[in-house]
Structures are given as C-alpha cells and as structure tokens.
Amino acid sequence: MTIKLHDLQPARGSKTTRTRVGRGEASKGKTAGRGTKGTKARKQVPVTFEGGQMPIHMRLPKLKGFRNRLRTEYAVVNVGDISRLFPEGGTISVNDLVAKKAIRKNSLVKILGDGKLTVKVTLSAHKFSGSARHKITVAGGSVTEL
C-alpha cells in the first residue's frame, strides 16, 4: 500500500491546545500552578537579583580608559638583536629582518634602543626610538625612516 498526501496525519499527542491558566477553578484556576503566597506567586524577581546582597556588577571595579582601535601596532626589534643577528653589519632593511625571522612579513617595524650595538649598520625601518637612533649614529651607522 502506498502512502498518499491525504492519508498523512500528525502524530497522536503532538497537537494539543495550550492550557489557559487562571481561568476558572476547573482548569488550573485560582493560583494557576504557582502554589500559595510568596514572591513567586505574586511576581517574578529578575535572574540577576541576589536577594538584597550587593550585586556582582556593582562589587566589581569599573573599567578605566579604553582601547584605541586606530592604534598602529609595531613589531619591536632592539638594537641588541640587530648586533646579534647581523654581526657583520651593513645595510639592513625590513626584508632582511623578515629573512632572519626577527619579525613577521607585512608588519610595521620599530627599532628600540635596548642592548649594545658594536657594528656599523645602515638601517631602514618604519620608526626609531630616540635612544636607538643615538646608538646607531654613535656606532657610525645611519637610519632611514620608511
């Protein structure tokens, strides 16, 4: 026997009318399934209510400041790292730093002045700190901002 569209019926018990509570004593009237007396019988308290105790959102400190979405992030390379990675000195570009895996590709580079520089370097990067610029020039090198 084949099933046809006009033979289909919903499953038994799946189509029940919802019980209208509080509409007469015969069908969940009077207290409407809420029990007798108390806060829950009269109204509902918010989920966040902590019984009069100081709420968690008021106990925690407020956040100060904000995080600037327009801030430019720089990959940091110190002068000491440059003298370690390039002991022979010479001309160093951003691509050379990527090749030595000091930074990742497509990142802006800032050179900071931590460490000692003993070799003469000609460095090109996006930013230089004052101390890094000073140490490079004292060692006999030069800087170029991109």
Swiss-Prot record:
Residue numbers spanned by region Disordered: 1-42
Does the record's keyword annotation contain Flavoprotein? no
* Molecular function via GO: rRNA binding; structural constituent of ribosome
Q: Which GO terms describe its biological process?
A: translation
Q: Which residues cross the membrane?
A: none
Q: Which InterPro entries match?
A: Ribosomal_uL15 (IPR030878), Ribosomal_uL15/eL18 (IPR021131), Ribosomal_uL15/eL18_sf (IPR036227), Ribosomal_uL15_bac-type (IPR005749), Ribosomal_uL15_CS (IPR001196)
Keyword Iron present in the record's keywords: the answer is: no
Q: Which GO terms describe its cellular component?
A: cytosolic large ribosomal subunit
Any single Pfam family the record assigns to this protein: Ribosomal_L27A
What keywords does the record list, in alphabetical order? Ribonucleoprotein, Ribosomal protein, RNA-binding, rRNA-binding
PROSITE patterns assigned to the protein according to its UniProt record, in alphabetical order: RIBOSOMAL_L15
Task performed by this protein: Binds to the 23S rRNA.
Assembly and binders: Part of the 50S ribosomal subunit.
Family the entry assigns: Belongs to the universal ribosomal protein uL15 family.
In terms of NCBIfam families, this protein maps to: rplO_bact
Indicate what this protein is called per its UniProt record: Large ribosomal subunit protein uL15
The source organism is Mycobacterium leprae (strain TN)
The organism's lineage is: Bacteria, Bacillati, Actinomycetota, Actinomycetes, Mycobacteriales
Which gene specifies this protein's sequence?
rplO
